[in-house]
């Protein structure tokens, strides 16, 4: 079987609102194929807020 890896860093802050849902989809066009997600990870670094009280 052929295995593919997709890895991309995207600054989502520039494209989406503060609250979003993340997902994915796949297609082969008109043909049938089975897709297996063997690994999935999502990492977010949120800037902290400070209070001036």
Curated annotation (Swiss-Prot):
- Which keywords describe this protein according to UniProt? Lectin
Signal peptide start-end: none
Q: Pfam families annotated for this entry?
A: Lectin_legB
Query: SUPFAM superfamilies per the record?
Result: Concanavalin A-like lectins/glucanases
- Would you say which domain of life the source belongs to? Eukaryota
Q: Name one GO molecular function term.
A: carbohydrate binding
- Subunit notes for this chain? Tetramer of two alpha and two beta chains.
Protein family according to the UniProt entry: Belongs to the leguminous lectin family.
Query: What's the protein called, per UniProt?
Result: Lectin alpha chain
What species is this protein from? Lathyrus clymenum (Spanish vetchling)
């Amino acid at each position: 079987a052929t295995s593919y890896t997709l890895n991309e860093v995207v600054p989502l802050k520039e494209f989406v609102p503060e609250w979003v849902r993340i997902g994915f989809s796949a297609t082969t066009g008109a043909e049938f194929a089975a897709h297996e997600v063997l690994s999935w990870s999502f990492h977010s670094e949120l800037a902290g807020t400070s209070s001036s009280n």
